[in-house]
Amino acid sequence: SGGFGKLPADRDSMEYTIMTYHSYVGSSATATYTNQVWSYPQSLMPYDIAALQHMYGANYGANRGNTVYSWSPTTGELFVNGVGQGAPGGNHIFMTVWDGGGVDGYDLSAYAGGVRIDLQPGGWVVAAEAQLARLSLDGVHLASGNIASALLHDGDPRALIENAIGGSGDDVIVGNVGGNLLLGGAGRD
């Protein structure tokens, strides 16, 4: 009672949880993981965070101030308020951002191509297709995005990312229920 139940088949992959046996939706659970090298999650994913919050509550002290998240197009390194967090291998970005409060933003202004930013809880950011995780050895199955926005715990909007800055290409930016500031930059956004 009060549990999550079985994970829906269309969410049973590393894109949503590291507690899966599937590299991508529809992959075999009897075989080993099929991700290419450097294409594994770099953080807990949205449903992992939701499960922990269900059991222990949400940590709204994590990055509770005004926080800007940005990534390097050449290395994939995450920067939090301009401070590098270490570059991932292979220039792939595959993570979820949980933020405890403040007025926060994704800054993808360093990207020359068009980016897709969905600020809705569980939404995906695609900074660059070249930086997407390859979830199959043949490279056919790509992650849905580079960065997932965490789900809201009990509908609490403190975890929303409110702002987004796109790249210099043709961007698509989707806001959320927060007071969003959405800047497309150059290009036809």
What are these regions (language model features)?
Residues 101, 110-112, 121, 165-170, ...:
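Extracellular, beta-strand-rich repeat scaffolds characterized by small/acidic residue-biased motifs
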Residues 18, 96, 105, 116, ...:
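Discrete beta-strand positions within long extracellular beta-solenoid architectures
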Residues 14, 100-101, 156, 177:
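Parallel beta-helix/beta-solenoid
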Residues 43, 88-89, 152-158, 164-166, ...:
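Low-complexity, polar/charged sequence tracts that form flexible coils or short amphipathic helices
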Residues 34-42, 83-85, 90-93, 147-150:
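Active-site rim elements
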Residues 15, 45-51, 157:
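Stable alpha-helical elements in mature extracytoplasmic
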Residues 10-13, 88-89, 97-101:
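Extracellular/periplasmic catalytic domains that process cell-envelope and extracellular macromolecules
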Residues 2-12, 22-31, 54-82, 103-145:
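GD-rich hexapeptide-repeat beta-solenoids
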